[in-house]
Amino acid sequence: MDIKEKKFKDIGRYALCFAMLFALSWLFPYTGDDWAWGSQIGLDRLHTWFDNYSGRYVGNLIVLALTRSNMLKSLAMTAAITGIIFLLERLIKERWSFYISIVLLICLPKAVLRQAVVWTAGFSNYVTSIFFTLIYIVYIYWIFDEEPNQNKLRQRILPCILLVALGMINTLIVENVTLYNVVLGIAVIIYVLFRYHKVLIQHVCYFAGTICGTAYMFSNSVYHSISSNADGYRSVAKGGIISQALKNYFDVIYKEYFMNNIVLNLFILCICYVIYVNYKKQSVESKNKLGKVLAACLGIMTCYDAWSLFSYIGLGTVTKQTLLIVIEGSATVAAGISLIIFALIMAIHYTNFWRILFVACSVLCMAAPLFAVNPIGSRCFFPSYVLFVLFAEELCRIVADNFIIVINEKILKRVAVTIAGVGMVFYLCIFASVYRADHQRISYIRDKVSAGEKKIEILHLPYESYIWTPTPNKGEIWEERYKLFYDIPQNVTLNSVWVYSK
């Protein structure tokens, strides 16, 4: 296959991906806080420059724009998600990354999907933040190569302004990604200094941008209210940092961060087994203590993934008791440590250590701030999930670079395309029904308002488990915001029902 044909196929697969994601994004309804951002409430927040609301200035501006145009929203969602897939492929430098990324993103846990992707307000913070962060990771990823391009170690003035701007953008969207980017900025400078004995001006500029952005974000008066527990919604470590961290971990983090990633975890486990089997064939060390450590790590991960699968199937809609939560939370720690140990040992053996270590630290660092704040939702874990996908693909790169696997690549690609295609059609069916019902109910309400009725029934949407805050209930704050967004008189009462009474 010549270069032109490869480029044509590359453009074709991304064009198809873009088209399907655009169609899907178009069907996503505006829900929950979207109704506030897209109404006068959003403009009021803008007029005060979000004072005492949040320091997510870039994220706030994005959601203000996206809640005013479904076309703009659909284009932004499509561009960001396609961009994430493209940037992951740039990091891995293999075309198979495209197919793995699509399959694993389609298998995103439902709770994360509805809060971080389907919900426009969630997308504006959590998808955009990791998209912009990946841009900088792509820019610096070469520093972890075994034999880096020495030409890249030169001082470059030209990109400095753009890097300062990128650093500021990455620290003005969502808080945990803000802190991650500050750590990323200084860590890159220190790593390059110790490994290459240089300090590159472009890295310093990015770090300076993150410092400026972080200072500006946390200068918002809302963070003083949060830190003093005077905010009515958000708080920091009320009962002490350790007790808050334990509460957050066992209540939310272990499930949303790791355990609920069923498909991703099983995929990583399969790749680990492929690596281990080939390692045993190649190395005499596989029979010594190191080999036993690797086998033990695999055993723990296998038991954990099996438990996670059974827990998801059997207890997915059941409130778990304290004992089970403690067992699962503790098992998650054991499985996570086992995965890191296994990956780092294999990375050392197959000369991929620094990239694996960087991604592993990134996954941990991205979630670390969530231990200290309250509340945290499923949407907070989308950036971590994307980094987990990168981690999985780095493990795949160990396989691709070091082993001869007797599997037809075309078959693997067809399997991935089939899974991705079925997944997209599944979601298109789900959200086409949601889109139709959403437009029908607003038309119904407007007809009733035109007829002079003051008490109107509002029908629940189908498949509400895929949507965040889909239907306003009478007396809730969402009822007021829904009416503002759709220009329904405030003296009209909306009563949510599953079936119209007449």
Task: Annotate each predicted stretch with a short phrase.
Residues 52, 103-144, 174, 322-341, ...:
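Membrane-interface micro-motifs in multi-pass membrane enzymes
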Residues 156-186:
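Membrane-interface alpha helices of multi-pass inner-membrane proteins
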Residues 99-108, 207, 285-310, 348-371:
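Transmembrane alpha-helix segments characteristic
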